[in-house]
Amino acid sequence: MIITTKALTVLPHSGLRTTHRSLLARLRHYFKNMLCPDLHPPATVRGMKLLDRSAFSKTIKVPHLLVPKDKNLNDICRASKKYLLKMERYKPVITEQYKITLHPLAVQKWEDLADLNLEKLDIGSEALVWEEIQLKYENWKYDEIFKAVLPADKEALSSFSKIGHIIHLNLKDHLLPYKELIGQVICDKIADCRTVVNKSLSIDNTYRNFQMELLCGEPDYRVSVKENACLFEFDFSKVYWNPRLSTEHEKIVKMLAKTDTLFDLYAGVGPFTVPAARRGCKVLANDLNPDSYEALVNNCALNKVSKHVTCHNKDAVDFIKHEVKQALLEKCTDESMEGDIHITMNLPAMAVEHLVHFPGLLKDEDVVLRKQPLVHVYCFAKGVEDKKQIARELVEHWLGTDVTDKLKEIAFVRNVAPNKDMMRVSFYLTEDLLLGRTAVKKRQHEEEDLPQLEEAKRPSNKMKDQRKQLAKKAKTVFSVSQVKKGNLKKTKEVSSNLKKIQVNDKREKVDKKFENLHAQIVSKKAAKPAPKPLPAKNKSKPDTKKIEADLNEMQM
């Protein structure tokens, strides 16, 4: 069942203003129809990309209860209410013919109506007949049509947002071939819908708006929306508005007292600012987007709270360094000031990065702060780990200090995507932090820290390449495990290289020995005097022992 994002009583964001009892009844009939194949759209519409309404027509047989005209039809209708066939734009009671159409899954034989005690009214089993009825495109809801048309093996359209007369979709890639049909069906089936758009690109970090594609209806993006008892008017194509955040807006506003002061750093069109001002709070609101600023000023006037709000159109960093700084000096040092100070930072893609400007914001001032501002900063926590811990680490990283003694609350806001949640971290700006007395960790290469902190924990591509190179080198190193496995290919190669080195080393040593021996022989011949002739019988024998010793040494 598709869920829309207009606040309700039982199903959040269901888009239907109804009571608990009637909503449960609608759900009961919805699932009852889903369990009956005869009440499904024709199977032939599967894969349809251009809407053909006539292709949804089908004829089925269903049970009917024929009521005698002398009986009270209204009483019997009330008694048989749970057995009625309820479908979109189909009347189960035909007053002129005194005929009641029953659900084929609930009534298959006369005994199924035993609890109605029809015999006491002189109505017998002959009153139950099976007759054909014609079902058309108009008799199915949009979610039943999508279930019949879209691919059965892939995720169907699960949700959408309703902003005034605009239906805002965020179609996944596999649904894009069906976008025209989806837009037309939604425009046909949802009351007050005049425009259907699809988000075509991601939200721009500068102005928090996105490019959209018109799927069906009028290109009219001026809307009027009610939220938290306030009226907002804006051009949806130029500003950021998310109805899924209405509950979060309400939570923050309920924290505020009449005497409190609110600094809204990314005010948008005023979902925090306007209801806070209606409570009597003093609000300093800022937004960089000129269209958001214009809508903010207009919405303050529209809700008659302009006297409580000061609007600015500038960069959030400049707003912190000037307007917020000056206001903090005035309010935090004023002994007569009542109420608390709150700072909302609802720009989850980059709000945590602006926390770096708060430590030491008042370091050049010789003041004593009597108030500790409470910051509500929003961020995206990505990963499978504890999202609250990830959000806390993000805040501590950009704030440069531990927030254990400053932390008030870490709250889940909404799920954005698989393994990606929007979180709120509420913490106090202490006097030591604002005056620069708290030691702040230095961040190197801050421009490289823009991704989520947990992303930085993962090995970079450069590190992965280094690891691959080290692994390749490690493969050529002799290891004991290779010997155990019998893989001696690399071992043989290394051992043969070592043998060659040892042989070459021995040859060099032997050559040096020969050179030394040759030098000794030459020097002895040069220093020895000419020999005198001796008698033959007294001829001296050569000293062979020394020569043998030298030869043995060379061989060694």
Curated annotation (Swiss-Prot):
Reaction(s) catalysed (UniProt annotation): guanosine(37) in tRNA + S-adenosyl-L-methionine = N(1)-methylguanosine(37) in tRNA + S-adenosyl-L-homocysteine + H(+)
Any one biological process term the GO annotation gives: mitochondrial tRNA methylation
Role according to the record: Specifically methylates the N1 position of guanosine-37 in various cytoplasmic and mitochondrial tRNAs. Methylation is not dependent on the nature of the nucleoside 5' of the target nucleoside. This is the first step in the biosynthesis of wybutosine (yW), a modified base adjacent to the anticodon of tRNAs and required for accurate decoding.
Localization annotation: Mitochondrion matrix; Nucleus; Cytoplasm
Quaternary structure note: Monomer.
Principal location listed in the UniProt entry: mitochondrion
InterPro entries referenced in this protein's UniProt entry, alphabetically: MeTrfase_TRM5/TYW2, SAM-dependent_MTases_sf, TRM5-TYW2-like_MTfase, TRM5/TYW2-like_N, tRNA_Gua_MeTrfase_euk
Keywords recorded for this protein, A-Z: Cytoplasm, Methyltransferase, Mitochondrion, Nucleus, S-adenosyl-L-methionine, Transferase, Transit peptide, tRNA processing
Name of the molecule in the record: tRNA (guanine(37)-N(1))-methyltransferase
Binding site for S-adenosyl-L-methionine: H249, D287, L288, D315, A316, N346
The organism's place on the tree of life at top rank: Eukaryota
Listed GO CC annotations: cytoplasm; mitochondrial matrix; nucleus
Region (Disordered): 444-465, 524-556
EC numbers, comma separated: 2.1.1.228
GO molecular function: tRNA (guanine(37)-N1)-methyltransferase activity; tRNA methyltransferase activity
